[in-house]
Amino acid sequence: RFEEAESLYRGDYLEDEPYAEWCAEERARLREIHLELLAGMAKCYAEEGLFMEATRVCRTALANDPCRESFLRALLENLVNLGRPDWAAAHYATWCRSLNAEYGFQPTHETVQVYERLIGGRSVENG
């Protein structure tokens, strides 16, 4: 059912009119519902051991909201569960650079802790 609901989402409400103030609240509400749906999908897939599908959903969510660190943390967990801590480390490094360059942000303490727990002292080069 998650997949069915997700397939109906076609992007932000009236995305061709991003500055239309009259629909901004509804656009934000529908966007949040979509992100909550993606969070539920990722969680269910991960619980079922479908880590590739969970990874796909997390990437979709991060494309829609790159600052939503809960999706990054879930993505890192799923990549490690797929046996690809090297991909997780590379994705984390890229995400940190992008977040800093575009928004001037650093990852939260919680995200750094998850990364360190999952990846430890492993670098992108030594996988």
Which sequence ranges carry the predicted segments?
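Intrinsically disordered, charged and Pro/Gly-enriched terminal/linker segments
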Residues: 1-127
